[in-house]
């Protein structure tokens, strides 16, 4: 089970986008996530007449390591780490600071 999953709201802890908030769009491998509006790079693309794509500079979302992001706790309004707790025989993600279950 992953502590940070797709559609979680996260805050960036380090790097050029420190403090930015965004939603996880997808996981890349086990240790990287792509966050909406964070770590955007400019990529040059060639025109392709077969697909009708025009060339130029395109913004591309790049992966960021999961250790550089933390879950956003709406109750406190701050970044929070996630842990796991056994509730009725099921493994549930909880916020480390409050022990409340993470809303999906």
Swiss-Prot record:
Q: Which GO terms describe its biological process?
A: translation
Could you name the Gene Ontology cellular component terms for this entry? ribonucleoprotein complex; ribosome
Keyword list (alphabetical) reads: Ribonucleoprotein, Ribosomal protein, RNA-binding, rRNA-binding
Entry-linked InterPro entries: Rib_uL2_dom2 (IPR014722), Ribosomal_uL24 (IPR003256), Ribosomal_uL24_KOW (IPR041988), Translation_prot_SH3-like_sf (IPR008991)
What's a single GO MF annotation on this record?
rRNA binding
Pfam families, A to Z? ribosomal_L24 (PF17136)
Q: List the disulfide bonds.
A: none
Q: How does it assemble?
A: Part of the 50S ribosomal subunit.
Question: What family does this belong to?
Answer: Belongs to the universal ribosomal protein uL24 family.
Task performed by this protein: One of two assembly initiator proteins, it binds directly to the 5'-end of the 23S rRNA, where it nucleates assembly of the 50S subunit.
Q: Under what name is this protein listed?
A: Large ribosomal subunit protein uL24
User: Which species?
Assistant: Janthinobacterium sp. (strain Marseille)
Annotated gene = rplX
